[in-house]
Swiss-Prot record:
Coiled-coil segments on the chain, per record: none
UniProt GO molecular function: G protein-coupled receptor activity; neuropeptide binding
Keyword RNA-binding on entry: no
Membrane-spanning parts: 32-52, 70-90, 107-127, 149-169, 189-209, 307-327, 339-359
Extracellular side, ranges: 1-31, 91-106, 170-188, 328-338
Cytoplasmic side: 53-69, 128-148, 210-306, 360-723
Keyword entries, A-Z: Cell membrane, Disulfide bond, G-protein coupled receptor, Glycoprotein, Membrane, Receptor, Transducer, Transmembrane, Transmembrane helix
Gene this protein is translated from: GPR149
Species whose genome carries this gene: Gallus gallus
Record family assignment: Belongs to the G-protein coupled receptor 1 family.
CDD domains according to UniProt: 7tmA_GPR149
Name this polypeptide is given: Probable G-protein coupled receptor 149
Length: 723
């Protein structure tokens, strides 16, 4: 084979006289060149489509973020790289040598886009690290940040161009290679390029270590379902809108990923809550502090940071083999055609990953819980988080996926001198503290019963009175008349077998599910300030609770009733000698068969109830199981009532047989059998059954306490409207 003066063989393969031996197998060389040509063509076509798609998508964005501007410039670099690749394909296919000006131009453009991409990868990582960890300096307007970033991008292009024209000034030169044209490996200019790349690589490595944890190391399930929330410090529950006011501390999810969203809301850091898109949609309510569109933009912006980090890491790492090959060939003179070809193809692949960033808006849930899962399955549940930790637990019931774990802390109760409540975290937006009515004795009595202003509008203009009013097929609950150490108000109404009027007024933990039960409402009011409270206005023992929804099948004629209880004691922890437990809260969910249905038919057998289990957080004993028993009143007293027990070991509710006892039990076991707590309350199911019959017979018949309270609410509202 003859060698041309331009060091090109007839098939276009370059040879360097001092450093390279002449190929003895031209057929294999031609085969490798065909493979190289086909691979280059496929990658180049992919880069062309991807860069056009990225540019069009990014330029169509109305609100361009700083990161999207950098990625737009990367798409321009990818589009520019198509020019030298096309020239390289001509070199690989043709047996003629390229003119030196064309070879120099293609090598310069190829090196320019490579240096520019690596520098911009470092810029992306630096900006992400700066914006996340320096939140106090991010108060400047978005327009100023965009202008600064434009100058940074222009500076990178200028620096990259200056580096690439150095061979034209005499330092090194561009010569043909086996795959196209590149710099002469014998020149010290190669070392300069390697130093520039090493600086970018080192900066990217140092900053990406903390960013990887902050942006990628999380569990999306924990984001969409906030399992553990601390109400006393202003944390929200799943499906709960924020109520921001001077009397209400701001809500903020406890989540390592959400903490990194601080830079999005510096102006409202103390008055706004970050809502995940799924939570905002499942609640059916628009947060008061920010609309869904803004919350969506926050989530998309955070996803852009995730994918931009992946994009920067991929681009810089794919250029690493090329840089290693250049330095090794410069120092040792060793050349491997296969490794050199592979390095070239990897640099082309670096230009194909840019469109992944555009898909970040559609892949918000990735890569959390997919690529890296660093979920911590433990939660601090005591008032001092570093002291007492219980094993975290969660549950998914058969037909439901909505759940929440709550904590009521001793520090959560604050009230001012005029008797107004200053802490309220509930599912209805609290815009003002509770103010006792100025009416007569009846109104004064109601002041101890109500935990929220009945005149205050609810989620969709629904007043508290309306939401507390029982429906034809269910009971609604609110505070009992007796004072409590911590008022936790639960409203649960079962619109079972019926269409609830205005379903948008209801809340549900289950996305896309037609709400049939309202979620629990947590609120602290004046009724808590009782002599049983310790000095500081707090619970003697903070309470933990988890709740869920379970579906049961009940034939017509049965009535279901569920009660939940809170427990408290005078000591700071439960001991065998201090076992006096006071039950001061209960609520029921009733279900009556439709009286219009034929008594001989089985109609409306689907019954849905809420279960809520409470445990004492400061109890140092490990709890194996927490049980709440719900009995079903049967038409025949001979049939035993099914009950449910939640087992944390089995992570589910299991059915248990309680015999013929008609009562509700809350069992809190401990390691010491003598210190087990077993609370038994007489069943109220029979009262529901009797009441459901009398409701249709006489309007002034037997009424339960909750119905009388609802009646008082309605009378109070009517008096307010008349005044």
């Amino acid at each position: 084979m003859s060698v041309m003066p331009s060091n090109l063989s007839l098939n276009g393969t370059s040879f360097f006289a001092e450093n390279h031996s002449i190929m003895d197998k031209p057929n294999e060389q031609r085969t490798l060149n065909v493979f190289l040509f086909c691979s280059t063509f496929i990658i180049a076509f992919t880069v062309l489509l991807g860069s056009i798609y990225s540019l069009v998508s990014l330029l169509k964005l109305q609100n361009k973020s700083t990161i999207s501007m950098i990625v737009t410039s990367l798409s321009i670099d990818d589009l520019i790289s198509i020019v030298p690749v096309i020239i390289f394909m001509l070199t690989q296919w043709s047996s003629d040598a390229l003119p030196q000006p064309l070879c120099t131009t293609s090598a310069l453009i190829y090196l320019f886009q490579g240096i520019s991409s690596n520098l911009k990868g470092s810029l992306i990582v630096s900006y992400n690290f700066y914006s996340i960890n320096k939140t106090e300096t991010m108060n400047c307007s978005a327009s100023k940040r965009r202008v600064s970033m434009v100058w940074a991008i222009l500076s990178i292009w200028i620096v990259s161009l200056l580096i690439c024209i150095l061979p034209l000034c005499g330092w090194g030169k561009y010569i043909p290679t086996t795959w196209g044209c590149f710099t002469d490996h014998a020149s010290s200019y190669i070392l300069f390029l390697f130093i520039v790349y090493s600086l970018c690589f080192c900066l990217l490595t140092v900053l990406s270590v903390p960013l990887t944890y902050q942006l990628l190391c999380s569990d999306e399930q924990q984001l969409l379902h906030v399992n553990y929330q601390e109400i006393s410090r202003g944390y929200i529950t799943p499906g709960t809108p924020a109520g921001c006011s001077t009397a209400t501390p701001c809500l903020s999810p406890v989540d390592p990923v959400d903490k990194t969203l601080k830079h999005f809301q510096n102006a409202c850091l103390s008055s706004k809550a970050v809502f995940r898109k799924g939570v905002a949609e499942s609640s059916g309510l628009e947060p008061r502090c920010m609309n869904n569109a803004k919350s969506r933009s926050f989530t998309v912006g955070f996803a852009q940071k995730r994918f931009s980090l992946i994009l920067a890491l991929t681009k810089v790492i794919l250029w690493l083999p090329m840089m290693i090959q250049m330095v090794v060939q410069h120092i040792t003179g060793y050349q491997s055609f296969s490794f050199e070809t592979l390095s070239f193809l990897l640099t082309l692949l670096a230009a194909t990953v840019t469109p992944v960033f555009v898909l970040s808006e559609h892949w918000i849930h990735l890569p959390c819980g997919c690529i890296i899962n660093c979920r911590r399955n433990s939660y601090a549940v005591s008032s001092e988080e570093l002291k007492t930790k219980h094993r975290g637990f969660e549950f998914n019931l058969s037909f439901q996926h909505g759940y929440g774990i709550y904590r009521i802390s001793p520090e959560s109760h604050h009230h001012d001198g005029d008797g107004k409540s200053t802490s309220c975290h509930n599912l209805l937006v609290c815009e003002k503290p509770y103010e006792p009515p100025r009416g007569g004795g009846g109104g004064a009595a109601l002041a101890e019963l109500s935990t929220t202003d009945s005149a205050r509008p609810g989620p969709a203009g629904l007043s508290a009175t309306d939401s507390a009013r029982p429906g034809p097929a269910g009971f609604s609950t609110t505070d009992s008349a007796r004072p409590s150490a911590a008022g936790v108000r639960g409203e649960a109404a079962s619109g079972l077998g019926r269409t609830v009027e205005g379903p948008e007024r209801r809340l549900s933990h289950e996305e896309g599910h037609k709400p049939e039960l309202t979620d629990w409402e947590w609120c602290r009011s004046k009724s808590e300030r009782t002599p049983r409270q310790r000095s500081g206005g707090a619970l003697a023992i903070p309470l933990c609770a988890f709740q869920g929804t379970v579906s049961l099948q009940a034939p017509t004629g049965k009535t279901l009733s569920l009660s939940t209880y809170e427990v408290s004691t005078e000591g700071q922890k439960i001991t065998p000698t201090s076992k006096k437990i006071e039950v001061y809260r209960s609520k029921s969910v009733g279900h009556d068969p439709n009286p219009e249905e034929c008594p001989n038919t089985f109609a409306d057998t689907s019954v849905k109830i809420h279960l809520e289990v409470l445990e004492i957080c400061d109890n140092e004993e490990a709890l194996d199981t927490v049980s709440i028993i719900s009995n079903i009143s049967q038409s025949s007293t001979q049939v035993r009532s099914p009950s449910l027990r939640y087992s944390r070991k089995e992570n589910r509710f299991v059915s248990c047989d309680l015999g013929e006892t008609a009562s509700y039990s809350l069992f809190i076991p401990s390691n010491n059998p003598d210190s087990d707590i077993n609370i038994t309350i007489p069943d109220t199911v029979e009262a529901h059954r009797q009441n459901s019959k009398k409701q249709h017979m006489e309007r002034g018949g037997y009424q339960e306490e909750i119905q009388m309270l609802n009646k008082a609410y309605r009378k109070r509202e009517e008096d307010g409207n008349s005044n």
